[in-house]
Amino acid sequence: RTDFLRNFYRKYEGAPVLQVDEDSLEMFNEFILAKSFPAAIRRVREHRALGHRTLLITGALDFVVQPLKPLFDEILAPSLEINGGKYSGRMTHVPPIGETRAAALRSYADENNLDLKESIAYADSTSDLPMLEAVGFPVAVNPETKLATLARRRGWLVENFQPISGSPKKTLPLGSKKE
């Protein structure tokens, strides 16, 4: 998955930072809000209302998830190198995926004096298993089949959040447009 992201993010090579910043809100609306789950947003707000510290650890680039900043106390996301006002297409550090995500969580907990055994983590993929295993209250949300099976076997909470009804669905063209 890390190699996939590295290759995918190379497509940003030469992209002007200012233009990408302007486009990031549109990207957010198209890729994030189109998959938005109101229950997930409510859940984060409930955690904050209870005084819980909220952290989003994601493999999505920082400028893509920046509009979520008001919802979370902190966001850990990969960044791209910048040279002369343009993105290089190279990440500044390894994206937080798999064990790297769990290590980022442990590091964050250490730096902020947090007890992971009293913490909750939400995830949908088996690649997030190390992070889920690091906390006292793991939750599989809209999990892939393998994670759902494992979570149930381990007695973890499994939740299925529903997307916004009427969300725009991106479709691929079936052929070239007719003139």
Question: Positions of the model-derived regions?
Answer:
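N-terminal helical cap/lid subdomain that shapes the substrate entry/recognition surface
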Residues: 1-13
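C-terminal cap/substrate-recognition subdomain and adjoining C-terminal extension
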Residues: 17, 22-23, 29-179
